[in-house]
Amino acid sequence: MLFRSPTAIDLRLILSVIKVSANLERIGDYSKNMAKRTSVLLQMREIDNAASSLRRLAKEVELMLKDALDAYIQRDPERALEVINKDKDVDQMYNGMFRQFLTFMMEDPRNITACMHLHFIAKNIERMGDHVTNLAEIVYYLVKGEIIEHVRPKGDRTSFTVVRPEDSD
């Protein structure tokens, strides 16, 4: 590149490498945080179905990451779009888990500590999915030279969740 003028694709490639590495670093940060929380959870009693729900969520994000990296290597914008579309599924799974953890905490206060750690692990996995979606958007931009013009809605509906304890009357 030093012996010629850089083209648009050259500049997009440089930009994509920088952005991809930043997103992968954040995914690594979330993984580290999850490992710390897991060591605490090992000392607590197991919450019904929580482990299998987390595994399903993590598997979905893992497959998205594989597809996003494959799209990057193969410069495949269609595969990148498929990854972007899967983000909604991850958000829905996370929102369901959030409600599930709230239910477990309300049913038995002894579940609160474990459910909070599980919630943060699920949130970390959901955020990993968001970073994987960023990777897919970067791939699309790299190949097509176009920024995807959709505004990604925040799939996390937990900010609007209201829990009302049952009346004691």
Question: Where are the model-predicted features located?
Answer:
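Cytosolic, long alpha-helical scaffolding segments
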Residues: 1-169
